[in-house]
């Protein structure tokens, strides 16, 4: 059977659905591991948004008269696995938070690419209701990525750099290390 753009769209939609469900399981560990209260709050907030993304994808399936089902997303699984490995490293607190931000942003960028593709394909096929739903999620993914950037640039990276290179003056004098010893993830 020859596949069409509609088939590719459904395949990508199933991939995104599975990715969001995997992230619902992974985000609590990121939140628990974060030492920065603001970073913890960002992960907790995005967990709630991610649950909403799952529900929205179910709405998109409904607009297409398709049953919601996922297709294992190897891409997000790999990103999550890399994040788990970083968590298992003995980072000091600020370094851990910087590594968590990097992991979170990898996931956000993956999702933004997926949603951008889904929106373009839905628009090309005239699935206007799906476009509207997917655009809402894409905007939330962009906002989550921006929030992580703000946290990284707002002191976490400087604090981690100050611990890594105490001989260098951090760009932000207010960036004080939160902790200096090695840190293992809370399980």
Where do the language-model regions lie?
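Amphipathic alpha-helical hairpins
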Residues: 1-187
């Amino acid at each position: 059977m020859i596949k069409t753009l509609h088939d590719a769209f459904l395949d990508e939609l199933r991939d995104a659905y599975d990715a969001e469900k995997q992230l619902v399981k992974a985000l609590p560990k990121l939140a628990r591991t974060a030492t920065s209260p603001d970073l913890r709050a960002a992960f907790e907030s995005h967990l709630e948004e991610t649950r909403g993304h799952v529900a929205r994808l179910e709405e998109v399936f409904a607009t297409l008269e398709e049953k919601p089902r996922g297709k294992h997303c190897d891409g997000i699984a790999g990103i999550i696995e890399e994040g788990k490995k970083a968590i298992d490293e003995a980072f000091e607190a600020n370094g851990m938070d910087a590594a968590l931000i990097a992991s979170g942003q990898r996931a956000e960028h993956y999702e933004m690419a997926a949603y951008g593709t889904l929106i373009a394909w839905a628009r090309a096929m005239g699935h206007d209701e799906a476009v509207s739903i997917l655009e809402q999620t894409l905007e939330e993914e962009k906002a989550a990525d921006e929030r992580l950037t703000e946290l990284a640039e707002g002191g976490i990276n400087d604090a981690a750099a100050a611990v890594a290179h105490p001989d260098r003056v951090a760009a932000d004098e207010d960036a004080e290390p939160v902790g200096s010893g090695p840190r293992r993830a809370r399980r």
